[in-house]
Swiss-Prot record:
The lineage of its organism: Bacteria, Bacillati, Bacillota, Bacilli, Bacillales. Residues 14-126, 156-276 form the VOC domain. Gene3D superfamilies: 2,3-Dihydroxybiphenyl 1,2-Dioxygenase, domain 1. Keywords: Aromatic hydrocarbons catabolism, Dioxygenase, Iron, Metal-binding, Oxidoreductase, Repeat. Fe cation binds at H159, H221, E272. This is Metapyrocatechase. Its EC number is 1.13.11.2. Belongs to the extradiol ring-cleavage dioxygenase family. The gene is pheB. It catalyses: catechol + O2 = (2Z,4E)-2-hydroxy-6-oxohexa-2,4-dienoate + H(+).
Length: 327
């Protein structure tokens, strides 16, 4: 074993919330509540806050009305107040820090920053925990609220995937400043086309994919977790019957090995649903899995199931108006 082993950084604990932008706010709310079983926990101005029934925090999703679909921001929780201060120092050194805000519904003061590609992010420690109403309390004491009796309810927030003009640069930024660890990666003759990184034993809390037009700051998808593959078939049946577009029906990824499906919410954002956890990483000396792009189609993207459409590789939000070329 090398004596130069780099001590891991455990200052970021988890993906805590994501803000989506939607030009059809109320229709987006219907999708997430009526069909995915999420609960509205607050409204403020032109924003609505939601959570899944096994999310312990006040909210994990904020949807804000906007002219275009896309990403508002990504929120990370630090592992301690001291960890927050350490990460802020590194973010300030990077030149991409934007400064402190007092907080938002569901969390305390936060330090805002951007990725090199311009995705808005923030990191904080103080959070508000969800407090169920009496009728929502469950006898299952390790669950924060009852399983909803509507739709096919998702259980918790899982991960975010962002499109970027330079996946390699954004990946290294997250590794260097926040302590993320590289789990899997797609390369094409040395060029990085996609990275899956995490701060926990999950395969990823965030991924970066190549934006084919070199456009910056795009969202590829937001993912919520079921943990049971059959739930994906139940949801697909429900959504098709109610005329929601399913881009990729229930399927198994090669990269991450997760059972998945992709749909579009009414505002235009791609939403992924996970039917299981894929695989977990507990090895402290994990070597990243490197895929060559030529080996990805039919193996890395889909291991079991239908071939992924070109739109999965090309389309992010906001939607580009340029002609796109598959990476």
């Amino acid at each position: 074993m090398s004596k130069n082993f780099q001590e891991p950084i455990f200052d970021v604990a988890q993906l805590a919330h994501v803000e989506l932008l939607s030009p059809k706010l109320e229709e987006s709310i219907v999708f997430f509540t009526k069909y995915l079983g999420m609960e509205v926990t607050a409204r403020a101005g032109n924003s609505v806050y939601l959570r899944a029934y096994e999310d312990f925090y006040h909210n994990t999703l904020k949807i804000t009305e906007s002219a275009e679909a896309g990403l508002g921001h990504v929120g990370w929780r630090a592992s301690s107040p001291q960890a927050l201060e350490r990460r802020v120092l590194e973010l300030e050194k990077s030149g991409l820090g934007r400064g402190w805000i007092d907080g938002d519904i569901g969390h305390g003061k936060a330090y805002q920053f951007t990725t090199p590609d311009g995705h808005q992010m923030e990191i904080f420690f103080e959070v508000e925990y969800y407090k169920p109403q009496p009728e929502q309390k469950t006898k299952l004491l390790n669950r924060p609220s009852k399983r909803p009796a509507q739709g096919v309810p998702v259980r918790r927030l899982d991960h975010i995937n962002l499109m970027t003009s330079n996946p390699g640069v954004d990946t290294q930024f997250m590794i260097d400043t926040l302590g993320f660890r590289l789990r899997e990666q797609i390369r094409d003759k040395g060029k990085i086309l996609g990275s899956w990184i995490s701060v926990s034993n999950l395969v990823h809390e965030i991924a970066f994919m190549q934006e084919p037009n070199q456009e910056k700051g795009k969202l590829h998808h937001l993912c919520y977790w079921y943990g049971i593959p059959q739930n994906l078939y139940d949801l697909a049946d429900l959504l098709k019957d109610h005329e929601y577009f399913i881009e990729v029906p229930p399927n198994k990824h090669g990269i991450s090995q997760a059972f998945c499906m992709y749909v579009y919410e009414p505002g235009g954002n791609r939403i992924e649903l996970f039917g299981d956890a894929g695989y977990l990483i507990t090895d402290p000396t994990w070597e990243p899995v490197i895929w060559e792009m030529e080996d990805v189609p039919g193996n890395g993207d889909t291991w079991i199931g239908t071939a992924f459409p070109d739109s999965w590789w090309l389309r992010g939000t906001p939607v580009t108006t340029k002609e796109v070329v598959k990476p």
